[in-house]
Amino acid sequence: MQNTIRIIGIDPGLRRTGWGIIDTLGNSLKFVASGTVTSDGEMDLASRLCQLHDGLADIVHAHKPDEAAVEQTFVNKDAVATLKLGQARGIAMLVPARAGLPVSEYAPNAVKKAVIGVGHGEKQQIHMMLKILMPKAEFKGDDAADALAIAICHAHNRGGHRMRQALAG
């Protein structure tokens, strides 16, 4: 008998960190919740990171996921922006890890491929497929939609991902 696994997908960002929670049982996906944690751009960096930490910690505490998936970040031409995004991503990985959850990472093209079938697609294609895969899904904005897509990617890949982690030691 299979158990339902609750997955939180996290799309890290310093201004807005999207989160999406799904339940998966076998091949079935069920929307649970989604949203965005924001930080105040007028505050210093440390305070903004605290806001992201506290917001994500509240979500993890309220929804009690079993596993987490975080999108890997890309390097852009602005080194300072890349560094800040990396710090927000660190918070996105730290919060579920501190709650005892296994945390997996996925490249953006792997997320798109899992949801829309190709590694390069538009946001509207992701939104459309989310509604097809989970008709009751509700999301406001790209960040929450991306987070749900990350959770779906993990649901599709979690068995192989666990095996690779076990083999890596």
From Swiss-Prot:
Q: Which cofactor does it need?
A: Mg(2+)
Q: What is its EC number?
A: 3.1.21.10
User: Which enzyme class, named as a word?
Assistant: hydrolase
Cellular compartments annotated? Cytoplasm
What does the entry list as the binding residues for Mg(2+) 2? 71
Q: Where does Mg(2+) 1 bind?
A: 11, 143
**Pfam families, sorted:** RuvC
One Gene Ontology cellular component annotation held by this UniProt entry = Holliday junction resolvase complex
Q: Which reaction does it catalyse?
A: Endonucleolytic cleavage at a junction such as a reciprocal single-stranded crossover between two homologous DNA duplexes (Holliday junction)
Specify the superkingdom.
Bacteria
Q: How is the cofactor bound?
A: Binds 2 Mg(2+) ion per subunit.
Query: Which GO-annotated molecular functions does the record name?
Result: crossover junction DNA endonuclease activity; DNA binding; magnesium ion binding
GO-annotated biological processes: DNA recombination; DNA repair
Keywords for the protein's UniProt record, in alphabetical order: Cytoplasm, DNA damage, DNA recombination, DNA repair, DNA-binding, Endonuclease, Hydrolase, Magnesium, Metal-binding, Nuclease
Q: Catalytic center at which residues?
A: 11, 71, 143
Keyword S-adenosyl-L-methionine part of the UniProt annotation = no
Primary residence? cytoplasm
Q: What does this protein do?
A: The RuvA-RuvB-RuvC complex processes Holliday junction (HJ) DNA during genetic recombination and DNA repair. Endonuclease that resolves HJ intermediates. Cleaves cruciform DNA by making single-stranded nicks across the HJ at symmetrical positions within the homologous arms, yielding a 5'-phosphate and a 3'-hydroxyl group; requires a central core of homology in the junction. The consensus cleavage sequence is 5'-(A/T)TT(C/G)-3'. Cleavage occurs on the 3'-side of the TT dinucleotide at the point of strand exchange.
Task: Report the NCBIfam families cross-referenced here.
Answer: ruvC
Assembly:
Homodimer which binds Holliday junction (HJ) DNA. The HJ becomes 2-fold symmetrical on binding to RuvC with unstacked arms; it has a different conformation from HJ DNA in complex with RuvA. In the full resolvosome a probable DNA-RuvA(4)-RuvB(12)-RuvC(2) complex forms which resolves the HJ.
UniProt similarity note: Belongs to the RuvC family.
Identification of the protein by name: Crossover junction endodeoxyribonuclease RuvC
